[in-house]
Amino acid sequence: MEITLFDPIDAHLHVRENALLKAVLRYSSEPFSAAVIMPNLSKPLIDTPTTLEYEEEILKNSSNFKPLMSLYFNDDLTLEELQRAHEKGVRFLKLYPKGMTTNAQNGTSDLLDEKTLEILENAQKLGFILCIHAEQAGFCLDKEFLCHSVLETFALSFPKLKIIIEHLSDWRSIALIEKHDNLYATLTLHHISMTLDDLLGGSLNPHCFCKPLIKTKKDQERLLSLALKAHPKISFGSDSAPHFVSKKHSANIPAGIFSAPILLPALCELFEKHNALENLQAFISNNAKTIYGLDNLPSKKARLSKKPFIVPTHALCLNEKIAILRGGETLSWNLQEIA
């Protein structure tokens, strides 16, 4: 059995910086045609020059791959700065509530203050897409749900602004997406295939710790159903986020799962298991093209076959290891060729 996926798109990707970027980028740039690149670096991408500099670093270390750049939402994003970014091809704003995830210490404290709403109004006028890490302070399993009132306010106040709930994790958010025409979402591999049991049901597994948290069986099943039917308002976004094992095995574990090396084989396995392989093309590419208005992307064909693939346990960067999701396991699908 074989399947060919055309122009795979990762709508939510972290490729880090410097040596780590060079070590992990190929796992995404080779099989994927394009990816929405997250801006929460150690020095966040808060303006056009730093964003374009990072884009150039990605382009230098890849080929036949389109990084879709995003700006880190901040109070200094004037109308002029947004216009400058838009003229250079930047189409995404990423809003991080302060302190909610990795490198979000510079995030937005009050999501509904006057300055935030002013920036969103300008973003709507210029045709930006707003990507939001939709969590608010509260009990860890309810943080996304607690952000619903903010999402509703945004959706109603800015009806022409496309708003993406990144890495949807709570089944209660599905109704919001279906209620508001301008609300969309991305889904990760880990949120549609894993639950809290994978993180802490046995021994604590730091390599399954991410934000938003993987949640209950009900959440996983409801989100998986969206993916399997390729719901038209949902696109695939891996949120692949590499960290060194030395940091993952520490007293202060950073959030993030490195899934890039297994994405296409694991998705094929999952969709085949549920008799939904015919919908994988839409989930992995077509929906994103429609939602984000993407065209003129690098052409790419990923051919996979139903042959065993033993997942490597680690990727290497200098003298450090990066644990790969499902490392050491055998998947039933294998990436055979990229053209």
From Swiss-Prot:
Subunit structure: Homodimer.
Reaction it catalyzes: (S)-dihydroorotate + H2O = N-carbamoyl-L-aspartate + H(+)
Taxonomic lineage of the native organism: Bacteria, Pseudomonadati, Campylobacterota, Epsilonproteobacteria, Campylobacterales
Pathway: Pyrimidine metabolism; UMP biosynthesis via de novo pathway; (S)-dihydroorotate from bicarbonate: step 3/3
Class in the EC hierarchy, top level: hydrolase
Protein name per Swiss-Prot or TrEMBL: Dihydroorotase
Catalytic residues (positions): 239
Annotated GO MF terms: dihydroorotase activity; zinc ion binding
EC number: 3.5.2.3
Modified sites of kind N6-carboxylysine: 94
Cofactor names: Zn(2+)
Domain of life according to the entry: Bacteria
GO cellular component: cytosol
Similarity annotation: Belongs to the metallo-dependent hydrolases superfamily. DHOase family. Class II DHOase subfamily.
Binding site for substrate: 14-16, 40, 133, 243, 255
Disulphides: none
Free-text cofactor note: Binds 2 Zn(2+) ions per subunit.
Species name: Helicobacter pylori (strain HPAG1)
Function: Catalyzes the reversible cyclization of carbamoyl aspartate to dihydroorotate.
Keywords assigned by UniProt, alphabetized: Hydrolase, Metal-binding, Pyrimidine biosynthesis, Zinc
Binding site residues for Zn(2+) 1: 12, 14, 94, 239
